[in-house]
Amino acid sequence: MSEFTLEPLYDYPQREQVLALARTHADAVDRGERSPFENLREIAKDGLITLGRDGGSLVPQVSVAFDLATEDASTAFSLWAHRSTIAFFDAVGRELPAGLADATVSGTTAMAAAYKEASGLAPIKVEGTLVEGGLKLNGSVSWASNLYPGGVIVLPVAVQNAPESHPNRYIVTVRQDVEGLSIDYHRNLLALNGTESGTLKFEDVFVPSEDVLSDNIEAFLHDVTAPFLLVQSSFCLGLAAGALQEAAKHLDVSQGVFRPEFPLILAEYQSLREELVRLASEPARAERRDLLSLRLGVSHFATIATHFELQVVGGAGYV
């Protein structure tokens, strides 16, 4: 008998339709026969990919990502990258490029390098050179997702020839099919096969001045970290919740050898769930340390939960 009930983070009116949509198309998305953006366009009709843009609670938005992840990891992951891109434009008070709000144009976040450099882990690998009317980009981004033709990409750039005492780190936006940008797509990805992920290579890509979103990378990261990490955390927690739901159906296999572990795992799940809702309720007041701690915690927990599911469900073959 199941000892785990998958409760919503927030019971929005369209929840059952979202779950049914993800469940129905999960296999086709994973096989590459259906784009996650077909799902996102469906839920965008009800405004479910632009929740919380007013700076208030992000609980409804993280709830949608959580629910998608319990059924379809690729669509939930694509929502995170797309919603983060929307947050980047909101953070600098820019109007959204046409198509982002209804997912007819994809949004790609290539911001990992900015966070790595801010943490002292690695430098930004895309370099910019100031030229008349803008700058030219050269370098690479090792991983980005939602790489569809015409898509909107946001990334950090290390400017090499900035005047002394001027900012030398920019946040810029480019289109996926801009001249000089090539993509090496990653295929056969575990759980994320439908996300159109790949490596970006920039060769003299011109960015006009109006496509520089910010030259204050510290302030920019401060403003976008909450939506960026909270939606990402909800994706991880939803993936874990889906694994626990499946494992709970098989706790009596192999003479119930795995059953004693389950209450401990559930306690950790409940703790992370409560912290996610707490931080998402007032994202503007969330401390960076708490956001990072949650993100690391749910990532680790997703590994534990999926491994537990593999043990328990796999054990059914030995009954």
List the predicted regions and their residue ranges.
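A generic structural signal for well-ordered coil/turn residues at beta-strand boundaries
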Residues: 105, 122-124, 149-151, 168, ...
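Glycine-rich beta->alpha junctions and the first turn(s) of the following alpha-helix
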Residues: 187-270
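Short loop segments at secondary-structure junctions
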Residues: 92-94, 131-132, 158-162, 176-179, ...
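A short core secondary-structure module
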Residues: 140-181
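Glycine-rich flavin
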Residues: 34-140, 145
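A generic structural signal for beta-strand entry/edge sites
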Residues: 132-136, 152, 197
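Alpha-helical interface subdomain recognition
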Residues: 2-63, 233-319
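Short glycine/serine/proline-enriched coil/turn segments at secondary-structure junctions
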Residues: 116-119, 144-147, 163-164, 191-193
